[in-house]
């Protein structure tokens, strides 16, 4: 005979775990932390694959990113409830209180930031303040600047692009404990310019504009009902939005060559990145020509596959 009390408890625990996965936006957080881990591995002083350090970086990254997302959902409880896409989130639906979300965010964010500093300390510099402070800054920028700004002005997309790209720099700095792009790293008798983290940051920074505007185009109805101002023009999807998507896609081409130029990776990855960038330009131009949701959706899905292809190509072809 089934013990109904035990079944109820198991269901309750499973539901709570599911709520926390939704609270931290697990899929989004995983994507963000993925870029952080790959950029850590791209640092010249990281040789081989240390599962322990990768696991620690993954956990720390998920805690910091999850903290930012939890605050975002607590702040946007009412607006999330207005949108079909987000109405079932734990705070918006009432399954979790704002206080619980904030408490989780405070604990997760603090632990994640401390992990970044402690576990990635170096014998020369000790506690990795660069990685810890960058993580804290990224969390603050996303949760307390970008989140409220979304209802005020579309410049929020520009502001949000910084915490969106900082994981690349954080991963690099976790490995090098150096933020200065003009500093040098000595690895096996060879000097490397510490510009790599900033190059990777630039790639992910520019990528976010066609990516996010495509999402905002597709979900414009939902965003409008919630009062979010995320497109370059207040009137909604316009030719100007498409031009912006094309412009940033084109800018991604020269920036995509920089890893090869600075000796971070080889020619094979350079051509793969170039091909991926040209593909993004083509999709953005199609959006400019057709000005419809179908084309915006193509840009959106193209951007989803762009980042893992580019990052993994650079890692596989690491110099």
PLM feature spans:
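Cytosolic, membrane-interface loops and tails of multi-pass inner-membrane proteins
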Residues: 2-13, 75-96, 213-241
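Membrane-embedded alpha-helical segments that form the functional core of polytopic membrane enzymes
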Residues: 34-42, 46-77, 85, 109-113, ...
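Functional transmembrane core segments of multi-pass inner-membrane proteins
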Residues: 48, 161-216, 220-221, 225, ...
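Transmembrane alpha-helical segments that form the membrane-embedded catalytic/substrate-channel core
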Residues: 63-71, 140-148, 201-220, 253, ...
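Multi-pass membrane catalytic core of lipid/isoprenoid biosynthesis enzymes
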Residues: 85-131, 236-260
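Intramembrane alpha-helical segments
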Residues: 98-178
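Hydrophobic alpha-helical transmembrane segments in multi-pass integral membrane proteins
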Residues: 169-181, 252-259, 306-319
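Interfacial loop-to-transmembrane junctions
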Residues: 237-240, 281-309
